[in-house]
């Protein structure tokens, strides 16, 4: 399995896919070509991002697009506190029960942190559902073939007139039992997915992680934390899911960081995509991105207050200039509590600009969601122009000024 994920190519798109004319971005960049987000760091708080996506590899001035990718939900955390040493054959016991064969990458290392996790909980629901369907089809084909063979064997026993009665009875019972068990396996099939072993070790002062689904890890490529290595892996099994690693607690915790859906990549592309074709660029192709996953895969990519606060603290630690949060929901009280207080601190104390979506609960008044309704945030609704109607929504344009789209949430807020 390669340590570097396959680059996902971008399809051709209309130059009007992003409303750069309506927002004044096109005119601004025509006049100030290098004022395109260079030296600006944007924290994208969302489902996480596909690190292999086209247009999100480099900035316009050649820097890495992502400075880091953090899972603020804890959903990808793996307990690697168990420390083991090599046995007489140079192997180590994996948490899966496998006896793991190490490669030359482990030379000179005496002890290893080990842990394990199932693959499926790490994957976005779209990839997980597709793989489960494919694996079920493969299992069903094999199982049906075995059931057909078992039925033929049973039919042959019943038709064999040369067998003594007692012998026929015993063979028939065995064949019927086999057929029953095969049918039961089909009916009770429950695929939990591959079990991954996670091996962590420190070498040359750098923590490194190896993730494998088999006993032979000789050809595995150790991955270091993303911020320093920019290493991206692929889980294989047809998942087409990129991931990076983070190491915490002195090697006792590993975070396998994946996205929980495509929304975060979509947002990151709008903000800062930089493609070979400038027409496919985002608003600020020179900007860098800190990807903070706040969409928890265990909650169908919903966010928690804890995840939001972790992401805001990370944005402060990395020195972000801007925060984008395209999440929101109804609220009983949006101006009190730790989440609101931390957003307020990000603006008033840490000097960041915070942009939050209004929500999609319009067109009624006072439908704006939280945390977009807090006073410190710049709350952004959805607008549509005649050209956007044709290019983005497949509706007939008409000669009228742009307007707020019907689904966009609106104010005023309760305060």
Segment roles from a protein language model:
Residues 307, 318-321, 325-326, 353:
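Conserved structured catalytic cores and adjacent interaction surfaces
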Residues 29-145, 149, 156-159, 166, ...:
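Subtilisin-like serine protease catalytic core
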Residues 303-311:
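Catalytic-core regions of hydrolytic enzymes
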Residues 45, 324-326, 354-359, 380:
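Active-site neighborhood of phospho(di)ester-bond hydrolases with catalytic His/Asp-centered motifs
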Residues 1-6:
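N-terminal mitochondrial targeting presequence
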Residues 338-354:
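Catalytic-core regions built around general acid/base machinery
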Residues 22, 26-29, 57, 331-333, ...:
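Active-site-adjacent substrate-recognition loops and nearby beta-strands
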């Amino acid at each position: 399995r390669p340590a570097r994920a396959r680059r996902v190519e971008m399809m051709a798109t209309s130059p009007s896919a992003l409303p750069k004319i309506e927002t004044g971005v096109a005119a601004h960049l025509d006049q100030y070509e290098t004022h395109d987000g260079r030296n600006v760091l944007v924290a994208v708080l969302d489902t996480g991002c596909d690190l292999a996506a086209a247009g999100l590899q480099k900035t316009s001035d050649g820097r890495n697009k992502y400075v880091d990718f953090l899972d603020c939900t804890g959903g990808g955390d793996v307990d690697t506190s168990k420390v083991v040493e090599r046995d007489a054959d140079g192997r180590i016991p994996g948490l899966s029960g496998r006896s793991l064969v190490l490669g030359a990458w482990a030379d000179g290392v005496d002890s290893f942190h080990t842990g394990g996790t199932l693959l499926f909980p790490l994957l976005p629901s779209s990839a997980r559902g597709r793989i489960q369907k494919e694996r079920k089809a493969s299992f069903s084909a094999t199982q049906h073939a075995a059931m057909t063979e078992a039925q033929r064997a049973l039919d042959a026993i019943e038709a064999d007139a040369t067998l003594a009665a007692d012998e026929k009875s015993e063979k028939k019972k065995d064949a019927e039992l086999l057929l029953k068990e095969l049918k039961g396996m089909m009916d009770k099939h429950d695929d939990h997915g591959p079990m991954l072993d996670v091996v962590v070790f420190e070498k040359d002062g750098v923590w490194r992680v190896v993730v494998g689904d088999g006993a032979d890890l000789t050809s595995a490529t150790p991955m270091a934390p993303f911020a320093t290595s920019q290493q991206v892996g692929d889980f294989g099994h047809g998942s087409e899911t990129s991931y990076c690693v983070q190491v915490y607690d002195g090697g006792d915790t590993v975070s396998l960081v994946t996205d929980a859906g495509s929304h975060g990549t979509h947002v990151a592309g709008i903000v800062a995509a930089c493609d070979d074709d400038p027409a496919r660029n985002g608003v600020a192709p020179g900007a860098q991105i800190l990807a903070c996953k706040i969409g928890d895969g265990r909650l169908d990519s919903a966010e928690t207050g804890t995840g939001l606060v972790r992401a805001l603290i990370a944005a402060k630690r990395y020195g972000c200039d801007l925060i984008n949060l395209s999440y929101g929901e109804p609220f009983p009280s949006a101006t009190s509590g730790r989440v609101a207080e931390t957003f307020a601190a990000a603006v008033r104390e840490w000097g960041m600009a915070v942009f939050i979506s209004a929500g999609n609960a319009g067109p009624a008044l006072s439908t704006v969601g939280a945390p977009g309704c807090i006073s410190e945030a710049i709350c952004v609704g959805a607008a549509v122009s005649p050209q956007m109607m044709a290019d983005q929504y497949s509706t007939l344009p008409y000669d009228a000024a742009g307007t707020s789209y019907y689904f966009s949430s609106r104010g005023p807020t309760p305060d």
